[in-house]
């Protein structure tokens, strides 16, 4: 999914949905880091992608709180 489409999708969601999505993304990041530490992770670029998605979600949550 393209970044701009993903951000627009995030902006359309409620804060509660974003919070739930943030928790899921953080759990995924934890699992990816664990897999990477045990040399089971094939696609290490996924860690960077998930980190960026977490930042995008947090940015949208902050913007909605400021409104």
From Swiss-Prot:
Q: Does the keyword Transferase apply?
A: no
- Top-level taxon: Bacteria
An annotated Gene Ontology molecular function = structural constituent of ribosome
Q: What does the UniProt keyword field contain?
A: Ribonucleoprotein, Ribosomal protein
Q: What PROSITE patterns would the database entry show? A: RIBOSOMAL_L29
According to the UniProt record, one GO cellular component term is: cytosolic large ribosomal subunit
One of this protein's Pfam families, by short name? Ribosomal_L29
A single GO BP term for this record reads: translation
Q: Which residues form a coiled coil?
A: none
The entry assigns this protein to a family as follows: Belongs to the universal ribosomal protein uL29 family.
Q: What is this protein called?
A: Large ribosomal subunit protein uL29
